[in-house]
Amino acid sequence: MALDKNCIFCKIAKGEIKNNRIAESNNFFSVFDIKPKVNGHALIIPKKHFVTLLDIPNNLGNEMLEFTKKVADKLMDEGYGDGFNLVMNNLAVAGQIVMHAHLHILPRKEGDGLRAIV
């Protein structure tokens, strides 16, 4: 899909909004969440506009997984957590707020106060 001119993540992808990228690949980038649930809460975002996981082409799946692992490993190495959760909300009924597909990496530490989702 093309970029959506009104989408905040598309604006970040195009460099229209200043951000501190954690990492970047050919088709994905990672930034810290602006309203973190825990210290080190990061987002994995496709550079192209896709609304949900179901819209991301299968041929990008391996890159997305490898990139997610790279970012999670970096967060762990930097001391943000001793474990982590991966969360992806797909559509409003499931809690998606920004309608641009993105994956949350939530570094976890003992006693961080974040309740388990499942």
Where are these regions (language model features)?
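HIT superfamily nucleotide-processing domains
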Residues: 1-118
